[in-house]
Amino acid sequence: CMVLCLVPITVFAAGGAKAILPGTSAQSILKIDKSRLSFAGHEWWVIGQKTDKSNNAPIITLLAVNNDFGDVPFRTGSAVPFENARRYSEDNGYYANNPSDMSQWRKPNEYAGSTLQQKMVSLAEAIPEKEQAVIRPKDITEGITGQEVKAQKLWAFSQEDSIYLYRNSCKYAAQWWTRSSNEVYGYGSWTIHPDGRSGSALNVDYDAAVRPAMELDLSSVLFISAAEHGKVADLTTPIAEYAGDEWKLTLHDSDRDDFTAKTVLVNGSVLEVEYKNAKVGDNEYISAVIKDADGSISRYTRVVQLDGTTNGTRGRAAIDLTDIDMTGKTLCVFNEQFNGDHKTDYAGALREVKLTDEIDEQFTLTPGGRYYFDLSAMNIPGTANSNLPDSTLHYV
């Protein structure tokens, strides 16, 4: 594992990708052992990519970058009895029992039910629900002793898997646990040294760092953007190119999909957009992007902050397109929760708005359908038609 110095700055320069990209570009822009993703309040190396054969979902594997998760024993143990523990005959020590919904361990270095495995469960449960929803559960069946563990959102690497880590992702700030036991003796498990070398087999009651891994399903990613200063709210300036490797996600939030928007007034280059059914509160916005003909995003802004007082769940927002050539482009408006640098954002489906007034009476007729048009308010002479659902309506 070679040492590579990383410069902690945001790099915007020609020749890179745009600082905001459609979610469909997420897997291709994230590079193994080079890209880092801010997610669930932590930073993660991208260490693997694949496609789910069952649904063609793009999947990435992540491994924690920083030693943010504390130290634990592989399994809590003591030389003397303690509550909810039992004796292991090989070393006459006492080790914590598995949770009641699991079979009990035969050796204390079994991963299922261990202190390390339960720590992974508690860390996963602390992740916000909408971020948990895009974590792909994994059945842990290999690289362990004892029973398998199903549907794990966070999990410890195996000792064998750690051998294949690259020069960046192999390093960590502390010696960290794998999930793999040392079969030479029944109360030891493997660790990895901070420099990435395969570590020692420690007694399971020793403390070492927790380093979680996870698999992320990118199907619900609406945008991927530079982790710092990537989503600059400025529609007048094209999105900058970004040569860095730190990214964050904007996830599609289906709870916002009843949001609607339409253009109701055009004054020169300024559109007045009427919106309804927006979420309000901290960090809630009406946002807009301009999409080029190829689907790429060329401009982004946050138009109105929805604090629930001045601006509520419905209202109007002015979008200034002065000096922007909209030929072949579309303007999309959406309801977004923008949470800042290195934090996951959430947004509803993009609503395309017209560059001209949208008249309420315009709609598409379905062939074979029956429609009634009431023009009574227009003072057109006619006779009431008793055969219509409303007999007060006139012939039209």
Where are each of the predicted segments found?
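Sec-dependent N-terminal signal peptides of Gram-positive bacterial secreted proteins and lipoproteins
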Residues: 1-12
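Collagenous Gly-X-Y triple-helix signature in extracellular proteins
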Residues: 15-396
